[in-house]
A protein has these predicted regions:
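N-terminal Rossmann-like NAD(P) cofactor-binding subdomain of oxidoreductases
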Residues: 1-145
């Protein structure tokens, strides 16, 4: 896989920080990282640590998604609903951790250990269920099969 431009929406929050850590630990081919957060984080001069560097946080706004290949969403529902469709319009594929798209019939709700193939039917946004749901489903999935 070639290096990707990856944006993390909500990069300064706890979930966003974990996403960054997972990207780094799994040696995901990030060519350029675009950490996005609120105006408050930008005004405070926040940075995120990634691959041994401090990367400045940019404002989460529609134009921030220009040239982005993948967006990992770790923002609140309202921010996700407002910005992820904008990212898709600009060509990104979004994996969202908020509640915003979980019940949307056009958005696959994916637990990779169970229904990873559903990713193929996405229209730009892929949702994941609540963490407690994932924890409950993974061990009982073999019983269902």
């Amino acid at each position: 896989m070639s290096d990707k431009t990856v944006a993390v929406l909500g990069a300064t929050g706890v979930v966003g920080q974990q996403m960054l850590q997972c990207l780094e630990e799994r040696d995901f081919p990030v060519g350029r990282l675009v950490p996005l957060a609120s105006q408050r984080s930008v005004d405070a001069g926040r940075t995120v640590s990634f691959a041994g560097e401090e990367v400045p946080v940019a404002l989460a706004a529609p134009d921030a998604f220009e040239g982005v290949d993948i967006v990992l969403g770790a923002a609140d529902d309202a921010t996700a609903r407002a910005l992820l469709p904008e990212a898709v319009r600009r060509g990104a594929v979004c994996v969202d951790n908020s509640h915003a798209f979980r019940m949307d019939a056009d958005v696959p709700l994916v637990v990779p250990e169970i229904n990873a193939a559903d990713i193929a039917s996405h229209h730009g946004i892929i949702a994941n269920p609540n963490c407690a749901t994932i924890i409950g489903l993974v061990p009982v999935w073999p019983l269902h099969q």
